[in-house]
């Protein structure tokens, strides 16, 4: 039977990871290793300056752990290299995240980081996120659509094989709409997220300042001279976006021009 490792950045008790397990439990043997507490926007952080403690969850056949103060990357690293080191995983899936991970969000995202860590460890990986309404960020319409999409995607992978080669992963974003309103999937590049750079300054009872970094509505910039619509465009039209991500961040188009710019300085 196929074996899938699940993680997230919303925490072990989050509704999204429970919905993900429910969607896949009849398709594969499911293992879950997730942070004990929410670790949203922790990016690719791993813990190297403090010990990590893994708590085995009772009644889960030894397949569930939560990691005290662990990040998604910690969870996947520990799962593959220690907790389940004798298990050969067919997939790592991170999610279902509460909120989008599109455009530059993928750099900040702990959800995407969990899938990146799976890729680094040599396992085909997927990150999946559920878009929330700007009017009510805490209540997605439901996970029904996200569950259907991940079931179909995983079944396709089991049938045809993982579609990417090398150090690459799939990033999936699911629109906040009903199954009836859903328009299907689009294969998209990342778009450009617009950040308003909000900082909220407050004063505590001791008259000391503290800050909350701003969270703002989903806004994006149109890609210029692009044949394909972006992940943002797909979501805006009630499509799911499926974006292939590459761990290699090198800007190959700029290597030659950079050499020319740097000519005379290179030895």
Curated annotation (Swiss-Prot):
It catalyses: a ribonucleoside 5'-phosphate + H2O = a ribonucleoside + phosphate. A divalent metal cation binds at residues 9-10, 40, 97. The keyword Metal-binding applies. One of its GO terms (cellular component) is cytoplasm. It is found in: Cytoplasm. InterPro entries: SurE, SurE-like_Pase/nucleotidase, SurE-like_sf. The keyword DNA repair does not apply. One of its GO terms (molecular function) is 3'-nucleotidase activity. Its cofactor is a divalent metal cation. Pfam families: SurE. Binds 1 divalent metal cation per subunit. Keywords: Cytoplasm, Hydrolase, Metal-binding, Nucleotide-binding. Its EC number is 3.1.3.5. Its main location: cytoplasm. Nucleotidase that shows phosphatase activity on nucleoside 5'-monophosphates. Belongs to the SurE nucleotidase family. This is 5'-nucleotidase SurE. The lineage of its organism: Bacteria, Pseudomonadati, Campylobacterota, Epsilonproteobacteria, Campylobacterales.
């Amino acid at each position: 039977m196929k074996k899938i490792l699940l993680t997230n950045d919303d925490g072990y008790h989050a509704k999204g990871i429970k919905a993900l397990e429910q969607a896949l439990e009849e398709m594969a043997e499911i293992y879950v290793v997730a942070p004990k507490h929410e670790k949203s926007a922790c990016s690719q952080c791993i813990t190297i300056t403090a010990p990590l403690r893994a708590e085995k969850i009772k009644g889960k056949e030894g397949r569930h752990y939560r990691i005290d103060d662990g990040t998604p990357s910690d969870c996947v690293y520990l799962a593959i290299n220690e907790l389940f080191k004798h298990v050969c995983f067919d997939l790592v899936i991170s999610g279902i995240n509460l909120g989008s991970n599109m455009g530059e969000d993928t750099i900040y995202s702990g959800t995407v980081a969990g899938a990146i860590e799976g890729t680094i460890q040599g396992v085909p990986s997927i990150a999946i996120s559920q878009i929330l309404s700007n009017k009510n960020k805490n209540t997605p319409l439901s996970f029904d659509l996200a569950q259907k999409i991940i079931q179909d995607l995983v079944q396709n992978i089991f049938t045809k094989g993982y579609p990417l080669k090398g150090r690459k992963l799939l990033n999936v974003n699911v629109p906040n709409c009903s199954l009836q309103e859903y328009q299907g999937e689009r294969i998209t590049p990342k778009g450009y997220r617009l950040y308003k750079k909000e900082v909220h300054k407050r004063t505590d009872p001791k008259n000391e300042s503290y800050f909350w970094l701003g969270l703002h509505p989903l806004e994006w910039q149109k890609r210029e001279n692009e044949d394909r619509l972006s992940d943002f465009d797909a979501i805006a039209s009630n499509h799911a976006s499926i974006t292939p991500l590459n761990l290699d961040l090198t800007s190959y188009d700029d290597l030659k021009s950079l050499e020319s710019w740097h000519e005379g300085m290179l030895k």
